[in-house]
Amino acid sequence: MSNPSNRASMRGQLTLRGVVIGVLGCVIITASSAYTALKMGALPWPIVFAAVISLFFLKLMGNASLNEANVTHTIMSAGAMVAGGLAFTIPGAWMLGYADQISWLDMFIVALAGTILGLLATALIHRHFIVDAALEFPTGNAAAQTLRATEAGGKTGKQLFGSMAIAGIYSVLRDALGVVPSMLCTLNIPGVTFAIYNSPMLLSVGFLVGFAPVAFWFAGALLGNFGIIVGGTAAGLFDVMTAQGIVKSLGMGLMMGFGVAVVLKDILPQVAGIVRGLAADSSTDTDEQSLISGSLKLDAGIIGLGAAAIAVIIAIVLDLGPVPAVIVTLFTFVTTIMSAQSCGQTGIDPMEIFGLIIMLIVAAFAQLAQVKLFFIAGIVAVACGLAGDVMNDFKAGAVLGTNPRAQWVGQAIGGIVGALVAAAVMVALVTAYGPDAFGPDKSFVAAQASVVATMVSGIPSVPWFAGGFIAGIVMYWLGIPAMMIGLGVYLPFYMSLTAFLGSCVKLAYDKWAAHRDATAGLSDEERAAKDAAFQEQGLVVASGLLGGESIVGVILAFVSVGLSLLG
């Protein structure tokens, strides 16, 4: 049982007015996110935007604490990644001519199953990633800094909102007006998207994550793009298309191997400890260990029963059969771990990649109609998208001192609302525009879903996937960040290069600060205080740049939806 102070804390942070504001905002943000993901082939995190809006409306209604605003924005932003999970997968089936075989109920069950699995998984992995590993989660940190600056005002507020304004204006010039290009320094290299992405957000991600982790990310990008694609084709080992398939397979294998290794090394021992009753007093440290019931043992039972129930629902309602349903349910827990690690270190949640991985695994063991494979990818993508959002929110809560149980309940509310809204918006769009409007060079590019449609035929290179899978497990046990390397191998080179440049700025920033402090003749205490203030300034400005671009991305989505409705 949780102690009274924790219950009081939860009641003070999860309020009726916060739930109402959060749900209304969730409906709007979820709808715009579905449209954005389909129209632009991308989906910016709405977390910072939701944090600012939540605090604004709560203050209009009277006094509001940062923790109440944090829980409210958790509800408000939850549906965005649910919408992204659907939009990044299901339209692939429309492109292949299966639109008439997918109903609103099918999409809702896909979204709901993914939402519940994501919630159950994050209750299990919260402590590992937020407390033990204490990953950066740059987007969650940005939300926390935004709330603090909004509350405190003063110099920190000016730095944050000034940098947000700069990034926001720049994003409008780039995305709405086309005054500045999206890509810089592009080179025509067959099979490699060599460019610098003209994005304050991605530069800030590199700055916030730091040089060392991003260096591994960039090393993976160099290996995949120049080692395999450029080097392999130059040596005559394979053509460009084959090399690209090898790179995708290797990247997926590395990330999958990492996810399995985390389960084997870190998560299963925790579960085994619960089963053996090693956590004798479930009332201690409940905010860090137990999010659902307040009891570690009861939580384990709830998670197990919940997962079993979802497997049954998937098997019956979506007609996948028992074996595929069990595979999807179990492996979704692995991919949510991968998602949490990726978001924690890079700020990027490649949810459709994880959906692809499990879809291809199921396809290798079961004979299913192609349209059913999209359901599998959708469930996993929704779960991973929601998990990334939850873990970012937990990070903001850790910074601000918010009760994680209140956040988890808020996420459940927002996730379920988001599942309803996202499915409805998807049906509305395909009904209004027709399935032929979705795909490359169409009104709705749905880039990620197009990739899923292409991959339905199978893993491009099974040997390279298997090799990457084994390497991912071994590398994690050796302390090598396989997830970062795998991301670098898989993601477009321009994203990795831009993030690396941001991390180089952070490296130079730290070295300049160290040199300045060393030559200033300060005492150890003065040097430590000045260095802390300097690091906070860098964090605030980088968070502002990240938040400014994400806020403008959401606002532009609102404008796009409005113009479409009017026109």
What label would you give each PLM region?
Residues 1-567:
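Alpha-helical multipass membrane-protein architecture
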